[in-house]
């Protein structure tokens, strides 16, 4: 456990971790301060951060399990102590950490007798288990058991739909919430017009993220929500039939490339892969996930299409514009 004395700055706004500990493999705690704040600011930031921590964070869970010859999820299998339902509940509790986008597959393939734990899950390189000792099932006889797993990274929660079983696979309720709890408190000091505040923020996580990582990610998510307001002067807002609509900034370089494409350049664009553009990893992964592999694929999508891509923001579109402008000569030749 790490604990530090609280020192209040009278000058620059700063944050600091004043306590950090790991209570167990699946329970981390962190306590942070932000100061000095003007009266009222601590509550504004504290409420926003708590909501971002509890509602906007992404997590990784097992969302589906598949094994042959299982009639329904409340059945029992000879040679296995637990029912299928109990095994699914145990899989639901497995805490994973990953940097993947979307879904991936994993596998359990063991021979009894013996105990099956999270250590027996064969995972892709992008996923790791927080607690290898988590129990899954007990094999009481020398039988072979193979279970295919689907792993997904998402936010919020996902409830399985009744009768929604595909090819003998069973959906698992998933809670994509690495932050188990978050609280904030305020300490006021000073008098009169010089009254200031210290914000205390407490974060508990399940090990998918550390409290410090959760604080950073929640902060980034909040910043991304407000970025469009910083560029409001670049956008045209208007009302039509009582509906609010937004017209995005022009895509000048896109128009220039469209002209090139009309000059028989389309074949060239088909063989310029986005790998060659040196895009940031997150933007690159989002484009690949949306089946955008070449410059031609990219140009066939409008700005509005790109904004609709999951986890994509207007700042990402502007970043692509900057990179295309930087590579103008390479693309135009």
From Swiss-Prot:
User: Which residue intervals make up region (Alpha C-terminal domain (alpha-CTD))?
Assistant: 267-333
Q: Which UniProt keywords apply?
A: Chloroplast, DNA-directed RNA polymerase, Nucleotidyltransferase, Plastid, Transcription, Transferase
Its protein name is DNA-directed RNA polymerase subunit alpha
Q: Which gene encodes it?
A: rpoA
Which range is the signal sequence, renumbered to this chain? none
GO biological process terms on file: DNA-templated transcription
Is Ribosomal protein one of the keywords?
A: no
Give a short account of what the protein does: DNA-dependent RNA polymerase catalyzes the transcription of DNA into RNA using the four ribonucleoside triphosphates as substrates.
Mind listing the GO molecular function terms for this protein?
Answer: DNA binding; DNA-directed RNA polymerase activity; protein dimerization activity
Q: Which family does this protein fall into?
A: Belongs to the RNA polymerase alpha chain family.
Q: Single GO cellular component annotation? A: DNA-directed RNA polymerase complex
Q: What is known of its domains?
A: The N-terminal domain is essential for RNAP assembly and basal transcription, whereas the C-terminal domain is involved in interaction with transcriptional regulators and with upstream promoter elements.
Oligomeric state and interaction partners are given as:
In plastids the minimal PEP RNA polymerase catalytic core is composed of four subunits: alpha, beta, beta', and beta''. When a (nuclear-encoded) sigma factor is associated with the core the holoenzyme is formed, which can initiate transcription.
Q: What is its EC number?
A: 2.7.7.6
